[in-house]
Regions:
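Bacterial N-terminal signal peptides that target proteins for export
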Residues: 1-11
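Bacterial signal peptide processing site
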Residues: 26-28
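Post-signal peptide N-terminal segment of mature Sec-exported envelope proteins
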Residues: 30-65
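An aromatic/glycine/proline-enriched structural segment found at the starts
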Residues: 48-50, 211, 219, 243, ...
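Mature N-terminal segment immediately following signal peptide/propeptide cleavage
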Residues: 52-92, 96
Length: 499
């Protein structure tokens, strides 16, 4: 499945959703600057981590253990004995950001093909075996990484680690299997993007907002690129990027770290080491004026979406850019981080309301440049221009008047509550740790980020509202509704869209 980061996941509970940020299925800002940060794909995020001898478990955060195998693969273990279940996730630091022009969608296509067999197992056999063990499995592809998971009774962990390691090392399939699965992926694109006006609006807005950054391309790929993609293209992509030094295995649940390390050495440790390809910087050039686009499509209501280029979090150092990224995250929560927040009160409530629904998101983390998003669905009798003006007026109000300390404390309290809630889920813990690894952050980033966010001041939020919301860094997209008459009936989802 494709997974475009929901920016709100980062803004509201910080890591409540782990995508984003975590950049399942094609969520987008309805969602995934005067000052502007141009970022390139991070070439070696692990450079932030201290060197570690191979095959040695080290406690790197509260209850979190990490080891590096001889072949370069990273192992992360988070014991949680509250229920007899275990989650294994395989994270590969490759997503659509690593694709080249003409090959969009190849990372996602490879995700699908990873379920199509190995030298020993036929198509779909891995999932069937996981189900027989009483578990479930799936995968997702984002702009920044690809991840595979199995959730099983803890006693079945050895079997699923062996299955996933076999797939990682020995994935193979015939050309006719690729042809069948490509038809499934194209239908996925039609159903989730081409037939969904808001998804098309988001896709076109990203393509307009980013000129050089690989975020210009959709994770699922342009249809023309899918048409020309070959089985050998996908095999070559896998050979380049699916190497141990570009991957991490995260295991969370009712497990013993030393036993998991022994299993990892037995299963993943035998995979030969290979070099990770170099990544060329592709910085986004400075934007020098507003960009606007309209999408005319059959729809019941208009949609107005505004995105502004903003700095993303680059590590945890106290830099001006990182401070601004955190302040923008707080700003998004002030605008739309709880029931009855500023945007809802100003635009949705009351007899003179401008919108039926609103949204504010900040892209806190990612391997590429980030966006702050404002969205509104105009109310009956209101125009997109009125909705846009109302959205921008609320940001301008904060830039002019600031934010009260009590309001900030309210959203910060919600972040802490979100952190506590997240820890009840073994899957969420595994997803959070894997995403931190993939984005080059330390594995104790949640506690450090909460500490940093709690220190954000009203003055910093006001300064961010003043700094990043000018016309010259904005890309505005409007869905202009067309008649629903003669619109084709939505088609049922075909079999095979699980991945």
């Amino acid at each position: 499945m494709t997974f475009t980061p929901s920016l709100r996941a980062a803004a509201v509970a910080l890591l409540l959703a782990g995508g984003a940020v975590l950049h399942g299925c094609a969520s987008h800002p309805e969602t995934s600057q005067t000052a502007q940060t141009a970022q390139a794909p991070q070439a070696a995020p692990d450079a932030q981590q201290p060197p570690q001898p191979p095959n040695v478990l080290a406690q790197v955060a509260a209850g979190v253990y990490q080891a590096r195998l001889d072949n370069g693969l990273t192992l992360i273990v988070k014991p949680d004995r509250r229920s007899p279940v275990a989650v294994q996730m395989l994270w590969v630091r490759v997503g659509s950001i690593d694709e080249v022009d003409g090959a969009s969608g190849i990372a996602h296509m490879l995700e699908h093909m990873m379920f199509k067999g190995t030298k020993q197992l036929g198509p779909g056999e891995i999932s069937r075996r996981v189900a027989l063990l009483g578990g479930r499995d799936n995968a997702f592809t984002t702009s920044d990484y690809t991840a595979y998971f199995q959730q099983v009774p803890a006693a079945a962990l050895p079997q699923v680690m062996a299955l996933q390691a076999d797939s990682f090392e020995n994935n193979q399939w015939p050309d006719d299997e690729f042809t069948r699965e490509m038809a499934v992926v194209k239908e996925e694109r039609r159903l989730r993007t081409d037939d969904q006006p808001r998804a098309r609006l988001y896709e076109q807005q990203m393509a307009a907002a980013f000129v050089a950054s690989p975020y210009h391309r959709p994770v699922i790929g342009w249809m023309g690129d899918l048409d020309s993609m070959t089985a050998d293209d996908v095999r070559a992509f896998r050979q380049s990027w699916y190497v141990p030094a570009n991957a991490a295995v995260v295991v969370a649940g009712d497990v013993d770290p030393a036993a998991v390390l022994a299993l990892a050495q037995k299963t993943y440790g035998r995979i030969p080491a290979r070099a990770v390809p170099g990544r060329k910087p592709r910085p986004e050039p400075q934007q020098h004026g507003p960009r606007r686009l309209e999408l005319r499509a059959p729809a019941e209501q208009a949609v107005v979406s505004l995105v502004f280029k903003v700095p993303g979090l680059q590590g945890l150092a106290a830099t001006p850019e990182n401070d601004d990224a955190l302040a923008l995250t707080v700003l998004a929560a002030v605008l739309d981080g709880y029931q009855g927040a500023r945007l809802e009160r100003a635009l949705v409530q009351g007899k003179d309301r401008v919108a039926d629904s609103v949204n504010a998101d900040n892209g806190l983390m990612g391997r590429g440049p980030q966006l702050f998003s404002l969205l509104a669905v105009p109310a009956k009798g209101r125009t997109p221009a009125q909705a846009e003006a109302a959205l921008r007026a609320e940001v301008a109000r904060i830039a002019r008047e600031g934010v009260g300390q009590a309001e900030l404390e309210r959203v910060k309290t919600q972040w802490i509550a979100g952190q506590v809630y997240k820890r009840d889920s073994v899957m969420a813990q595994a997803q959070e740790l894997g995403s931190y690894w993939a984005l080059g952050l330390p594995l104790d980033a949640d506690e450090k980020l909460i500490k940093r966010l709690r220190a954000v001041t009203p003055a910093q939020v006001q300064a961010a509202a003043r700094k990043y919301f000018g016309d010259e860094q904005m890309t505005a997209a409007t869905l202009v509704p067309q008649s629903l008459k003669n619109r084709p009936r939505p088609r049922p989802a075909p079999a095979g869209l699980r991945h």
